[in-house]
Each structure stands twice: as structure tokens, then as C-alpha cells.
Amino acid sequence: MILNWKLLGILVLCLHTRGISGSEGHPSHPPAEDREEAGSPTLPQGPPVPGDPWPGAPPLFEDPPPTRPSRPWRDLPETGVWLPEPPRTDPPQPPRPDDPWPAGPQPPENPWPPAPEVDNRPQEEPDLDPPREEYR
């Protein structure tokens, strides 16, 4: 049933876009003879001639505006002369002290416990490949 409603909707849409009216005396499109008299372009009657433009076809692109000589390098300052730096937009910061811990309790000299003593004597490396016994 849903398919029938969809088909009916498509049919109504097609009839509406074509402009079909109920009266037979007023066709929606004039006959071809009336169109020729109205001055509409006619279709070509033979094969196209090389070099001739297509009849009635509008140009694809409009002509671009005339180009004016643009030389942005002339706007640059002379060599060795540069524009001044623009002013900074960030708010000014108060001067920073040299001491990273300016106030309050100071950190201990070395907060870490002392490291264990390390034996720097060379140790013998263990033999990772012990000799194998032959199995019989």
C-alpha cells in the first residue's frame, strides 16, 4: 500500500511540474510553429562547420576584466630600510626575580637521601655458555 502512495505522489509531482491543466483548449507548450515565429534559436540543419561557433550557445566564460599592471615590489621599502616592529599586545609583566624561591621557607639543600655506596671494582662476568657434556 505504501508503494502505491509513493507512485501516486510521483505522478502528481510529474503532472504538476509539466503544468498539465484540465482544459484541452489551452496546451501548456505552444506548437513548434509558434516558437519559430517568436524568434527562438533554431537547431542546426546540417553538420557543424569547423571554426563556426555553435548557434545560440552562450559563451562559457565572460571576458576577464583588463589586467592592470600590479607591481607589489615597488611598495617595499628601499634596501636596508625595514618597517619598525609592531607594538606588542600582551600586557607588561613585572620583572622576575633572580631567586627562584623569593619568599617563604627555603627548600633543603639536598632533599634526596644519600645514595648507597657503589662498588667500582671490576666483577667477573658469569660464563653464560658452560661447557656441555656429551650424551651417549
Swiss-Prot record:
InterPro entries: SPR1 (IPR029271). Residues 20-136 are annotated as: Disordered. It comes from Homo sapiens (Human). Residues 1-22 form the signal peptide. GO terms for cellular component: extracellular region. Keywords: Secreted, Signal. It is found in: Secreted. Its main location: secreted. Residues 44-69, 84-116 have a biased composition (Pro residues). This is Psoriasis susceptibility 1 candidate gene 2 protein. Residues 118-136 have a biased composition (Basic and acidic residues). It holds the Pfam family SPR1.
